[in-house]
Structures are given as structure tokens and as C-alpha cells.
């Protein structure tokens, strides 16, 4: 997976987890603030509105609710000050307020502000007993950008489709020589000229494809659809003139009855199924490769939380396969008597077992605690690894979650996991020497 695509996938994953947490939160009265500011807004106007809201809050009869609302408004105003009256390029999302438990006691205070990974067009300000997350969910609509090349004997159009928005990037016409009906040397000469014109046309299309769909030496679309009414579309894809980086991104070649913008519209309609399944197609390919490694017992794979984390820490992992909803907590625990630290990865059920936090009768001190998936996302690059998110919405992904624990990896070299587990202490010492 290329860097820009992986970065976006990570941002989307983080937003999904944030939505899950925010949707569970409840506040006292109208004390939870949801504030979403698109880039076109003026921050001083928003600041003025928050100040006015603070003044109005003095009319709230309940002292507890009034204090909670005013505390949230104050925190919101303080956060906005950090931006020095300048909104980030993609706008700003802010959630603030005290979350209460079932007994009505303050359990946690949220103050979350961030720039979304792409521009947000929604304006929202709501004080409620819950956070409003629909604009975040709208951000997660699969809006990958796809490139289209509509080519025939009359010209070529280059366009993109992102969500419901299509854009024509560039188009040009061509006047190719027609077939010559007469015989003799004249026919041979015209055939040669005709072939030369076709090759020049294909070269121009291939060069323009690079201009439109490659930026900073990287393909800037998630996939390509090549469409046309004649054989040009197939010749282009098979041609050595067509950049191999783009050829690798071709998702489908479709026949359309028209060229130009009408052909663009028809190509979108005929490729709809392919475009909607692009994420699952990628997931199927990754999972098929993983299952093949397992079936052949290449020892260049691992699965399960314990084996995958050991392999990652020793630098053996090439690509981590992470189920997007993996529910494990990472603990770093310290024995207060010996000073020895250890790391545990626990399920919610294991966290309820107090024995996991006792060693030789000693209560272990928790130095670190946090969701394991977040630790992986924050640290995988330190070990030179790649990352692939896996869902349970494809058959292969669901099998990975059920049968392999939702965490696995492709390894750089063969690792005997049985030997790794048996000699864990020796491996830990080697890792300390190499990385500490």
C-alpha cells in the first residue's frame, strides 16, 4: 500500500474509533459541545459566538448543569485560542465536555480538536447531552478518487470520479488518416502513415496519462478505468508506451458507445460495481496471499497477538495485518520489588481477572495502559514494517478474524514460532542489544 493511501486509511481508522467512543458518551443536560468549522468560516466570528453562549449559560437553572456547560465552553474557547484566529486548511473539528456515568458522576472530560484528513463542508454547533458525530461518519464515506481514460479514434478524455463528483481533467481531439482503399505503392505508403499516426496518438495519450495521474512520482488515484468504443483502449493498456505504474492500477476495461463526456458518463455507470468493491478486492488479495503462506507453511507468516507482537519487536515483520476492531489492551507492568517490567496483551475478559496483575503475591504497577491497535498504528514504522487494515465484511477478512485472532503478519524471513516461544528470554536479550 502506498504512503498516501495508508496515511488516509490510518486517519479513517482513528476517526472510526473516535466515533465509537463519542457515541457512547453522555453528558449532564446540554454540557457536551460538538463544534465543526469548515475552512471557509472566520475563527473570530466563532470565538465571538462562544463568548455569547457563555453569557447565555448563566440562565441555566441547575447549578450542576450550568457549571458543566460553562466549563465546556471555557475549554472550547481555550482550544480555539491555540489556532491564532487561523483555521487549518481542511477546517476544524472539536468535541468538548464532561462525560458522566450511570450514577451521574463525572467519569471523564473530553477535549478533542483536530484537522480532518480532508476538507469538511459541514458547519455544526450543538450543545446537547450527547456528541453529534454524523459529520465524522460522512467523512468516512468511501470517497477514493478514480481515474478515467476515454479513448477512441476521434480523441481522448481524462477525468476523475470522487464520490458523486466527476471532473474532466483534460481532453483533446485527433484526426487520424482513414484506411486507404486503393492498391499499389500508394496504399503501402498510406498504411505506413496511418500506423505512424496511430502510434503518435497512443504516445500522446500515454504521456498525458502520466501528467494527469502521477504526481510527485506517485499514482494519485486509487484505480483506473480505461474505456472506449474501438480497439484503442486495449492497445493502450498493452502498449510499452503506457507507464507501468498506471498499468498496475487498471481496474477494468469497458466498452462504451460514445467518446468524450458522454462516454465518460457511460464508463462510470458500467464500472460502478468494480469501484464500490475496490477495498474488498484489495482485502481479498492480501488475505489470499496470507492463506497461501499458511497452507504452504512457509514460516514467513505469523498470527495471533502474542506471536505477531514478538515478531514485530524483533524486527521480523514486513507487513502487519490488523483487524480494524481488534479489542486488546496493551499493559506495561512493573514488579515493585524486583523492578522487572513485562508487557501483557489482554482481552476485556482477561482484564477482569485480577490474577493477571499479581506476581509472586506482589501487586504489579501499571506503567502504561492503552488499546493495542493504537500502539501498533503509532509504532509500526519504528520497526520498518508496513500496515494493512482488515475488516470482517469480506469472507476472507471474517475468516482471518475468526480463525487467526484478527492480528497477523507477513515476515521478512522464516521464523520458527515454536522455537521463538521456547527461547523468548534469549531473543529478548538479543533485541535489547540490537535496538536499545
UniProtKB/Swiss-Prot annotation:
Instruction: Give compartment(s).
Output: Cytoplasm
Which keywords accompany this UniProt record? Cytoplasm, Protein biosynthesis
User: What InterPro entries does its record include?
Assistant: eFR1_2_sf, eRF1_1_Pelota, eRF1_1_sf, eRF1_2, eRF1_3, Peptide_chain-rel_eRF1/aRF1, Ribosomal_eL30-like_sf
GO MF terms listed in the record are: translation release factor activity
Q: Name one GO cellular component term.
A: cytoplasm
Record's keyword annotation contains Amino-acid biosynthesis: no
SUPFAM superfamilies (alphabetical): L30e-like, N-terminal domain of eukaryotic peptide chain release factor subunit 1, ERF1, Translational machinery components
Any idea what job this protein has?
A: Directs the termination of nascent peptide synthesis (translation) in response to the termination codons UAA and UAG. In B.americanum UGA codes for tryptophan.
Family the UniProt entry places it in:
Belongs to the eukaryotic release factor 1 family.
- Could you tell me which PANTHER family the record lists for this protein? PEPTIDE CHAIN RELEASE FACTOR SUBUNIT 1
Instruction: Describe the subunit structure.
Output: Heterodimer of two subunits, one of which binds GTP.
Q: What is this protein called?
A: Eukaryotic peptide chain release factor subunit 1
Amino acid at each position: 500500500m502506498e504512503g498516501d493511501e495508508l496515511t488516509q486509511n490510518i486517519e479513517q481508522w482513528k476517526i472510526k474509533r473516535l466515533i465509537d467512543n463519542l457515541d457512547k458518551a453522555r453528558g449532564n443536560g446540554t454540557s457536551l459541545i460538538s463544534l465543526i468549522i469548515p475552512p471557509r468560516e472566520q475563527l473570530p466570528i466563532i470565538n465571538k459566538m462562544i463568548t455569547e453562549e457563555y453569557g447565555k449559560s448563566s440562565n441555566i437553572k441547575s447549578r450542576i448543569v450550568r457549571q458543566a456547560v460553562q466549563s465546556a465552553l471555557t475549554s472550547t474557547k481555550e482550544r480555539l485560542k491555540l489556532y491564532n484566529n487561523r483555521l487549518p486548511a481542511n477546517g476544524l473539528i472539536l468535541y468538548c465536555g464532561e462525560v458522566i456515568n450511570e450514577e451521574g458522576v463525572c467519569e471523564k472530560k473530553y477535549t478533542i480538536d483536530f484537522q480532518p484528513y480532508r476538507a469538511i463542508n459541514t458547519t455544526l454547533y450543538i450543545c446537547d447531552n450527547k456528541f453529534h458525530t454524523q459529520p465524522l461518519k460522512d467523512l468516512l464515506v468511501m470517497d477514493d478518487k478514480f481515474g478515467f481514460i476515454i479513448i477512441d479514434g476521434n480523441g481522448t478524455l481524462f477525468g476523475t470520479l470522487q464520490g458523486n463528483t466527476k471532473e474532466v481533467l483534460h481532453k483533446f481531439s485527433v484526426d487520424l488518416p482513414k484506411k486507404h482503399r486503393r492498391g499499389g505503392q500508394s496504399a503501402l505508403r498510406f498504411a505506413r502513415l496511418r500506423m505512424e499516426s496511430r502510434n503518435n496518438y497512443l504516445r500522446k495519450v500515454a504521456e498525458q496519462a502520466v501528467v494527469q495521474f502521477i504526481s510527485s512520482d506517485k499514482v494519485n488515484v486509487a484505480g483506473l478505468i480505461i474505456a472506449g468504443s474501438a480497439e484503442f483502449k486495449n492497445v493502450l493498456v498493452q502498449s510499452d508506451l503506457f507507464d507501468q505504474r498506471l498499468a498496475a492500477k487498471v481496474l477494468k476495461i469497458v466498452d462504451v458507445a460514445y467518446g468524450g463526456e458522454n462516454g465518460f458518463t457511460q464508463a462510470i455507470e458500467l464500472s460502478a460495481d468494480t469501484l464500490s468493491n475496490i477495498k474488498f478486492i484489495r482485502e481479498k488479495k492480501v488475505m489470499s496471499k496470507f492463506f497461501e503462506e499458511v497452507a504452504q507453511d512457509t514460516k514467513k507468516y505469523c498470527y495471533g497477538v502474542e506471536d505477531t507482537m514478538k515478531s514485530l519487536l524483533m524486527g521480523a515483520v514486513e507487513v502487519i495485518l490488523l483487524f480494524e476492531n481488534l479489542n486488546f489492551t496493551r499493559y506495561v507492568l512493573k514488579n515493585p520489588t524486583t523492578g522487572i517490567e513485562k508487557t501483557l496483551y489482554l482481552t476485556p475478559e482477561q482484564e477482569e481477572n485480577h490474577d493477571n496483575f499479581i506476581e509472586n503475591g506482589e501487586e504489579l504497577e501499571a506503567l502504561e495502559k492503552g488499546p493495542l491497535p493504537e500502539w501498533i498504528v503509532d509504532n509500526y514504522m519504528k520497526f520498518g514494517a508496513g500496515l494493512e487494515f482488515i475488516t470482517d465484511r469480506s469472507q476472507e477478512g471474517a475468516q482471518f478474524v475468526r480463525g487467526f485472532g484478527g492480528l497477523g503478519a507477513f515476515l521478512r524471513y522464516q521464523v520458527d514460532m515454536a522455537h521463538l516461544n521456547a527461547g523468548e528470554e534469549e531473543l529478548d536479550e538479543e533485541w535489547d542489544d540490537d535496538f536499545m
